[in-house]
């Protein structure tokens, strides 16, 4: 206590509502927040430095562990940066499957956000429902990659393997049902007086402040800024898809909640469009200097075996240069800045994680709010400490 009025407390790093090992030093006047100082680094693993001692292929699994709730979005951003340096084109089938999986990833990330955000405020039913739907997406991950979370599925030039025959039906059935599930969530929350009291007018940040800080993703669009990399700076074939970019009007927690629900509906539409575009074809580029040979060749010819061994043991050289690639991850703009010195390992990799930047808005959003409202504000930012600390 200072002057018997201002109290300084710690929230976290082990607190269920900080969504990871986030510590916040909070100054309070009674229950009113005066200042918040986020303290990060408890989950630092040195991903950027580790990449300098691994080949481009060996670096890919590290990206799974940034935002571990959206591994394929991480994979996509990294692979697009590598492919840009290599100058190779991805086959249409592989590109379409990438779109399907990154939009399913967006859905499952938003489902985890909704489940935890609702649970923080006391709506346990939505938590159970959202994790029920997420389980289907986790099963789809396992179906195509063998892993439920850290998928390591994308490759430079395409995918590690083609999807099985049952993939298309499973995804089509899920996205047909998903809008009805979203209706259920809205029926439980949107008109609920407790939910509205806890979210409307809470965590307000203006479009100007959000832009100045560098917020991206649903947190930015909730403040009324109409910006989405998929539409405005399209990549991976997104220019071929029709979808709406929702924005808020009141710049508060409730608007950010509504933006994410609409995004979930739009992701279902994108997946349906992608399924219609999904045609037979190769899932790896014709780039033998980068891509592994087919398994038949590896098992039945010495040339194929040597080819596989060379790429696995030495990696593939990437032309000298530097590139930045940003993608619209579920939480905002995820960027990879790669510098190549012509070898098979990155000279430097810099990750621009959306959660790290979005977290900088916490003081602006929470200043003057009640301590009890901080839980809702943290939830609406949808941060993951894996990508903040890296």
UniProtKB/Swiss-Prot annotation:
Keywords: Cell inner membrane, Cell membrane, Membrane, NAD, Quinone, Translocase, Transport, Ubiquinone. GO terms for molecular function: NAD binding; NADH:ubiquinone reductase (non-electrogenic) activity; quinone binding. It comes from the Bacteria. Pfam families: Complex1_49kDa. Its main location: membrane. It catalyses: a quinone + NADH + 5 H(+)(in) = a quinol + NAD(+) + 4 H(+)(out). It is an enzyme of class 7 (translocase). It is a peripheral membrane protein. InterPro entries: NADH_Q_OxRdtase_suD, NADH_UbQ_OxRdtase_49kDa_CS, NDH1_su_D/H, NiFe-Hase_large. GO terms for cellular component: plasma membrane. Its EC number is 7.1.1.-. SUPFAM superfamilies: HydB/Nqo4-like. PANTHER family: NADH DEHYDROGENASE [UBIQUINONE] IRON-SULFUR PROTEIN 2, MITOCHONDRIAL, NADH-UBIQUINONE OXIDOREDUCTASE 49 KDA SUBUNIT. NCBIfam families: NuoD, PRK06075.1. NDH-1 is composed of 14 different subunits. Subunits NuoB, C, D, E, F, and G constitute the peripheral sector of the complex. NDH-1 shuttles electrons from NADH, via FMN and iron-sulfur (Fe-S) centers, to quinones in the respiratory chain. The immediate electron acceptor for the enzyme in this species is believed to be ubiquinone. Couples the redox reaction to proton translocation (for every two electrons transferred, four hydrogen ions are translocated across the cytoplasmic membrane), and thus conserves the redox energy in a proton gradient. Belongs to the complex I 49 kDa subunit family. This is NADH-quinone oxidoreductase subunit D. It comes from Trichlorobacter lovleyi (strain ATCC BAA-1151 / DSM 17278 / SZ). The gene is nuoD.
